[in-house]
Amino acid sequence: MANRIKKGDQVVINTGKDKGKQGEVLRVDGDRVIVSNANLIKRHTKPNPQAGVAGGVVEREASIHISNVNIVNPATGKGERVGFKVLEDGRKLRVFRSSGEALDA
C-alpha cells in the first residue's frame, strides 16, 4: 500500500510531548517518520579523530509513528487526514479527505 505521507511533506504532530508542532518530513522508514525539530533525543558519542567526529552529547531527531502525524493543508493551515483517489488512467492521487483537494499535482 502506498504511504499517505512522503518526504518533504509539511506535517503537524497529533500526540506526545511535541503535540501541535509543525515540521517537514525528513525521512520515511516503513511506518515511522522523522520530522525536523521534533522528538529530539540526546545521544552520547565517543570522539573519533579518524572520522573527524568530536565526542560529546549530540541532539538529533528520533522517529515518530506515522499514525501520530497529519499533513498540513495549505489552505486552512491545519493538519488533515489524507486519502487516495484513483484516476481513469490508473494513477493514485493523494487528496485531503475533508475537502477532496488534490495534494499532488
From Swiss-Prot:
Pfam hit, one: KOW
SUPFAM superfamilies associated with the record: Translation proteins SH3-like domain
A cellular component term, taken from the record's GO annotations: ribonucleoprotein complex
Stored InterPro entries: KOW, Rib_uL2_dom2, Ribosomal_uL24, Ribosomal_uL24_KOW, Translation_prot_SH3-like_sf
GO molecular function, one term: structural constituent of ribosome
Gene Ontology process terms (BP): translation
Coiled-coil boundaries: none
Keywords: Ribonucleoprotein, Ribosomal protein, RNA-binding, rRNA-binding
Family from the record: Belongs to the universal ribosomal protein uL24 family.
Assembly and interaction partners: Part of the 50S ribosomal subunit.
Stated role: One of two assembly initiator proteins, it binds directly to the 5'-end of the 23S rRNA, where it nucleates assembly of the 50S subunit. One of the proteins that surrounds the polypeptide exit tunnel on the outside of the subunit.
Name of the protein described by the UniProt record: Large ribosomal subunit protein uL24
Organism in which the protein naturally occurs: Xanthomonas oryzae pv. oryzae (strain PXO99A)
Lineage: Bacteria, Pseudomonadati, Pseudomonadota, Gammaproteobacteria, Lysobacterales
Gene assigned in the entry: rplX
